[in-house]
Amino acid sequence: MTTLNTTGKVLYKKKMRVGRGIGSGKGKTSGRGVKGQKSRSGVAIKAFEGGQMPLYRRLPKRGFNAIKRYQAVIAIMNLEKIQTFITEKTINSGDVINMALLKKLKLINKNSQKLKILGTGEIKDKVNIEADLISKSAVEKLEKAGGTIQLKK
């Protein structure tokens, strides 16, 4: 027979009910202190791990942050693309191919600040190109096709 004095140890502690008056010991602020972010409900402090050193501070720094806002946005155009535009009659072979023309025809991004011509593919038509940057292979292929190149400074 089990009686109150022979029940044995309690296996778990009873859960404290908070906010049930000051006499309970956990009334009014319910053990949260006074005001501030930690006293409100539903608010967790981001990356806070209870005082333990957070993961982002335990790991070493890696790499660097490139300041991209100071770098020019370069539009890249290959010779094969230019040849395709000429064959499709998007660009006339007599036109001067420059950034203004390519932006007008929406062939490059409107935010581009410089135009670079690369030598991928072949070009058959004579073309006049005005660009900021150009690769050696592109220069060779354009001269071979009889085209002209004008570099902007």
UniProtKB/Swiss-Prot annotation:
One of its GO terms (biological process) is translation. Keywords: Ribonucleoprotein, Ribosomal protein, RNA-binding, rRNA-binding. The keyword rRNA-binding applies. The keyword Glycosyltransferase does not apply. It holds the Pfam family Ribosomal_L27A. Part of the 50S ribosomal subunit. Belongs to the universal ribosomal protein uL15 family. This is Large ribosomal subunit protein uL15. It comes from Pelagibacter ubique (strain HTCC1062).
